[in-house]
Amino acid sequence: NSWGVPDGPMFQAVLDWIDERPEQPFFALAYTIETHHPYVAEPPLVEFQTKDEKHQRYLNAVRNADQQIAWLMEQLAARGLADDTLVVITADHGESFGQHNQTVHSFSVYESAVHVPLVMLHPALKNVPQRRIEQVRQQVDLPYTLVSLLGCRPPDAWQGQDLFAAEDRRAYFFSTGNNVACGIREGQYKYHFYIDSGHEELFDVLADPGELKNLATEQPQRCDEYRRRWGGLIQYQPGFLRRHGA
């Protein structure tokens, strides 16, 4: 891979590092890289077949990463570490394969590029009812939640909230591609505003997860409110304003 080593040797290196200090607490970040372009799984794996060769390679690379994570969990259990280790599986972005004429992930705020998985594994979570969190959450909530699960109080200055809290919340986001896109996700609605072109999009992502029906002209007041909120936020970004004439 152009970014690093295959996932198998990477996980083995993580375990070797853990084995060097068996009595010490540890924090390890394992960055699976086979799912990054050009999506090459090692060893080669073909469990999924699609008409799009790149998409097929990607799906099989994800499957291989899944198998490597399962192997890691088995190795932690064999070392007696499974009951003392909080494992988090997530991602820094999604990946697009033609949705909205977009590929990869760098220049889009559509769900295919920004929706990521989040799985947490630890025996202490047995007291937390297993459930799928349907409300809006952000990665900024993850450190806050992990520290709370470990029995510590997050610093007051930290942003984020407990992932398991019941209330819904609002998420702001943006992408600095050729046409900068800002957005807000609140409940079922997701709003996109393209700074350079002024184009707006509003989607009901529960009824329309593929973001195919733009509701902006049908709900102008909602768009006005979301644009106003973003305007208040970017006032704290003077360089951003100068660059885009906002």
Predicted regions and their residues:
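Solvent-exposed soluble domains appended to multi-pass membrane proteins
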Residues: 1-246
